[in-house]
Amino acid sequence: MPLRVYNTLTGSKEEFVPINPGKVGMYVCGVTVYDHCHIGHARANVVFDMIYRHLLSKGLEVTYVRNYTDIDDKIINRANRDGVAYNEISERFIKEFDNDMARLMLQLPTFQPKATEHIPEIINLVQKLIDKGFAYQSGSDVFYRVDRFEGYLKLSKRNLEDMQAGARIDVDERKEHPMDFALWKGAKPGEPYWESPWGQGRPGWHIECSAMSTKFLGETLDIHGGGKDLIFPHHENEIAQSEAASGKPFVKYWLHNGFVNINSEKMSKSLGNFFTIKEILESYDAEVLRFFLLSAHYRSPIDFSDQNLKEAELGLERIYKALAGIDERLASGAHTPADADNTEFAEKVAGFAGRFGDAMDDDFNTALALGHLFDLVRVINRELPTASTGLLEKVKAEVAKMAAVLGICDSVPAAFLQRMKDRKTSDMEMSAEEIETLIAERAEARKAKNFKRGDEIRDLLLEKNIVLLDSAQGTTWKVK
């Protein structure tokens, strides 16, 4: 089936048809680098990394641009608070962001421009808007005339008059209209600045994205993405700037991811439920966090809680255990002839792969795609003992292909499962080695028909939340 995406601009799902056949230009708003990134930033970036991966998997040539906002009031305030230069703050948190994204297994975008490296392009764009009558100078500031742009608020579906009437807007005598927004800000004493035709100053937040997206992707983009919180004012203002300057549609498809709630409440510093990526990864594996963020449809809200993270961990382990089972069969040398294969198994694998692709083509429905992947895991576990090595190799490759679109299961299965065991036992009184020693002792006791001792060991481990799993292949264990 063709790829269909939900376009915020039209409010409907549409078939995705690139402006230039076979090529896609995608711009995603990056972070303002003044502090550590939180779970909401993680979701937005994981979502658009997944979208990037899926587009690539369909054979499209994707130019993916994600910016850094490295000059802003928040950065200046942080620099003043810490008593350092603004760029010391921005460079520090760019490194922190890059480290967080690497741990979450994001592929690098094609370009990662910084606002401060594109001041000439920003100044040229502001001047163009002034020349066309869409912007005006007021002292050393430059503002955009919102009532001059006919399509203003078409993305957020708001009404300018209603907003003006219902909002508490401080009177700003520099502005012609209360909703006008800054394109260029005159520098205050002690602030960083760049020379411009309007005096020393720096760019406003919205203009930088218009300038950088146009530089790298042209006047009309295929995809522009970000969180729903950016629809207004940021993306609305980008449209106003870019379309007024070029006279062309700015973006063909607007994509926005949903919010992250914390234990069913909106995330907020004032509520004390604000978590950085760094804090979360002290308690959970990065791949588990990524898996969790993809477990819901990207446009839906997702509820971050310990219970939901633990469920994500169990789900990811299920996939890895199936892959580990395949690896063990292949490594054992046990050979099952191909003519003994269950042809229904091979057909089911192909069917699941097709349904996975269809789910991803239906507005990147990762929740449904993961459901098909879990269905495949159940079939693998059932057919594993009797399938031929040749078929298992094909199944493993098919699972890897699906997982790669989601950016999961890139670890060696046995290594991932061991990592999970180590993490779970790190706070326990017993080490993994001690548990294995007791399991070996229990096996010897049972062999000697000393079932009382065997039961004692099982009960001792159960008291410490260690559950033993007996099978024909031996005994394994898991944390309860």
UniProtKB/Swiss-Prot annotation:
SUPFAM superfamilies: Anticodon-binding domain of a subclass of class I aminoacyl-tRNA synthetases, Nucleotidylyl transferase. GO terms for molecular function: ATP binding; cysteine-tRNA ligase activity; zinc ion binding. It is found in: Cytoplasm. CDD domains: Anticodon_Ia_Cys (cd07963), CysRS_core (cd00672). Gene3D superfamilies: Cysteine-tRNA ligase, C-terminal anti-codon recognition domain, HUPs. Zn(2+) binds at residues 29, 209, 234, 238. Keywords: Aminoacyl-tRNA synthetase, ATP-binding, Cytoplasm, Ligase, Metal-binding, Nucleotide-binding, Protein biosynthesis, Zinc. Monomer. NCBIfam families: cysS (TIGR00435). This is Cysteine--tRNA ligase.
